[in-house]
Design a protein with these regions (language model features):
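Pore-domain transmembrane helices of cation channels
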Residues: 1-41, 86-102, 107
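Membrane-interacting alpha-helical segments
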Residues: 4-15, 19, 48, 52-59, ...
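Pore domain of cation channels
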Residues: 49-107
């Protein structure tokens, strides 16, 4: 098995998939960012804390060092988590699609 050929095929196919879904990926990322900023503003966090918290929440890591206390912020947190799961799912699906393509089309 030639890993170099598979790797190149995977990267080309993955890049193609990202290019095709870029508007959706960008929209999800902006949604996470803007909703995180809204939560941060409501909670009195700095811009950096808001951005940090929104991406920690979107990736479902959730360290717990920052947490929303207001009801509206908590509802937005659920929405951010949903957007993050959707974004992660799309990226994983693209990776699986690209890997499957690379394995099927690379000789050897």
């Amino acid at each position: 098995m030639h890993f170099t050929g598979i790797t190149v095929a995977f990267l080309k196919q993955f890049a193609l998939g990202v290019e095709e879904t870029l508007p959706l990926l960008f929209t999800l990322g902006m949604g996470i960012t803007l909703l995180g900023y809204a939560v941060g503003k409501k909670e009195g966090w700095s811009g950096f804390e808001s951005l940090y918290w929104s991406f920690i929440t979107a990736t479902t890591v959730g360290y717990g060092d920052l947490r929303p206390l207001k009801k509206t912020s908590r509802v937005l947190a659920v929405l951010i988590a949903f957007l993050g799961l959707t974004l992660s799912g799309i990226v994983i699906a693209l990776a699986v699609w690209a890997a499957t393509f690379a394995l099927k089309t690379t000789p050897g």
